[in-house]
C-alpha cells in the first residue's frame, strides 16, 4: 500500500491514525507499505540535516514525533515491511509557490517552452503543479545525494 505524503499529511500527523491505517492494511492482507517521505515541495517528513522538514501543509501541523520512525516501528510490530519513496527531481509546488525552488534555489528549476511565453522557468508555468529540477545542476545533484 502506498501512502502519499501530501494527501495524508494531516491524517498522519497523529500516531493513532498511522496505527489505524497500518492495522487496516494488515487486516486485509497487505504485507508491505510504501511511505512517501519527500513530496514535490522538496521538503521531507523526517528530521534531516540536508533538507527542510515539512512541518505544515494546508494549515495542518505535523505531529510532535518522528513520522518515518513511527511508521517503521509500528509497521514492524505488525509484521509489515516498510519502504520509502521520494520525489527526486521535483522541489516545488507551483500551485502554492512553495518549495526549495521558491525559497532559496530558483536556479535549480528546469526551464520549459510554452507557445505564448517561450522558454521560462517551470516555476512560472502554473498549469504544471510540480516544479521539476534541472538534473544537470551539479549543486542540486550533490544536495539530493545527501538527502538519499
Predicted features, each with a name:
Residues 18, 64, 68, 141-144:
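Aromatic/hydrophobic pocket-lining residues that form the small-molecule binding cavity
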Residues 29-31, 76-82:
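Short, well-ordered coil/turn segments that N-cap beta-strands
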Residues 16-43:
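Catalytic domains of carbohydrate-active enzymes, especially glycoside hydrolases
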Residues 1-3, 33-35, 82-84:
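Hydrophobic faces of well-ordered beta-strands that scaffold small-molecule active sites
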Residues 69-72, 76:
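Anion (oxyanion) recognition and catalysis
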Residues 1-15, 89-147:
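Active-site-adjacent "subsite" loops/lids of carbohydrate-active enzymes
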Residues 55-64, 110-112:
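A short acidic, glycine-rich active-site loop
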Amino acid at each position: 500500500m502506498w501512502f502519499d505524503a501530501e494527501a495524508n499529511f494531516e491524517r498522519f500527523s497523529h500516531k493513532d491514525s498511522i496505527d489505524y491505517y497500518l492495522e487496516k492494511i494488515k487486516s486485509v492482507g497487505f504485507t508491505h507499505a510504501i511511505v512517501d517521505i519527500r513530496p514535490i515541495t522538496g521538503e521531507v517528513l523526517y528530521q534531516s540535516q540536508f533538507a527542510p522538514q515539512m512541518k505544515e501543509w494546508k494549515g495542518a501541523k505535523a505531529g510532535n514525533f518522528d513520522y518515518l520512525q513511527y511508521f517503521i516501528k509500528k509497521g514492524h510490530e505488525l509484521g509489515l515491511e516498510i519502504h520509502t519513496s521520494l520525489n527526486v527531481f521535483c522541489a516545488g509546488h507551483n500551485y502554492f509557490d512553495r518549495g526549495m525552488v521558491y525559497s532559496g534555489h530558483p536556479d535549480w528549476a528546469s526551464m520549459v517552452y510554452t507557445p505564448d511565453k517561450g522558454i521560462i522557468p517551470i516555476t512560472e508555468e502554473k498549469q504544471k503543479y510540480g516544479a521539476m529540477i534541472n538534473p544537470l545542476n551539479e549543486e542540486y545533484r550533490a544536495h539530493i545525494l545527501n538527502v538519499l
